[in-house]
Regions:
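P-loop NTP-binding core
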Residues: 1-229
């Protein structure tokens, strides 16, 4: 809240450390959900985070902004502050329609910021929770790829996230999924969670492929922990 409401720039007051070296978090403390209203009425509301990002750049190679999917001024602000945007979509007809009405419309609505020299990020669609066997899901996947194959500003990622039990299990345990499942279970067609996440990381950040290849998922199985400042 302090970052966006008061332009707080001291990282010691913003960042929470984790047990993983160089992996820090900025946790939301907007319990009363006041930021949406504040930013909506602020003259620089949608550009505030973009103007604050240089404060993080000397300290981090990558900043990931996790937002809610529902359209809001916070989501618009996050998009305008980003160089890449990843939107998950399930292979279901209702989700595909909502993608069209919501996310794609939002991307189109922020294009006028180009007149201010702000280039909206390219949108990358991640097909999520893909069932092992479903002709309908396969058809929707193929349709999504066909629709966007000639749109330079929208890419459907080659990596797909299958509907395997490892992902909810990892969330329940508070662990990265690649530490929960680094080998493919016998008899399952889908890749191991480690290989899936590595493939996604390689697509999103190809400059770090060698580092991703060195990740084995066999690190000590400690639960995720956040140390607040």
């Amino acid at each position: 809240y302090e970052l966006l409401a008061f332009n707080e720039r001291d990282l010691a007051n913003l960042v929470s450390r984790t047990v993983i070296d160089n992996l820090d978090l900025v946790l939301s403390n907007d319990e009363h959900r006041q930021l949406n209203t504040l930013l909506l009425h602020a003259p620089d509301g949608r550009l505030r985070l973009r103007n604050l990002m240089p404060n993080f750049q000397p300290h981090y190679d990558l900043v990931v902004i996790d937002t809610q999917g529902a359209r809001s001024v916070l989501l618009e602000m996050a998009l305008l502050a980003s160089q890449q945007a990843v939107s998950p979509v399930t292979p279901e007809i209702l989700a595909a329609r909502e993608l069209r009405r919501g996310t794609l419309q939002l991307v189109e609505d922020i294009t006028p910021y180009r007149k201010l020299g702000i280039e909206p990020p390219a949108l990358q669609l991640l097909i999520n929770r893909v069932p092992a066997v479903s002709s309908n899901a396969r058809l929707i996947q193929q349709t999504l790829r066909l629709i966007f194959q000639e749109q330079a500003s929208i890419q459907v990622l080659a990596t797909e996230i299958p509907a395997i039990e490892a992902f909810p299990r990892a969330a329940t345990r508070g662990l990265p999924v690649h530490r929960v499942e680094h080998r493919r279970p016998s008899g399952r067609q889908a890749l191991a969670a480690l290989e899936i996440v590595r493939g996604l990381a390689n697509e999103l950040c190809p400059q770090w492929q060698e580092r991703f290849a060195a990740v084995t998922g066999k690190a000590g199985g400690r639960f995720a922990h956040v140390e607040r400042p």
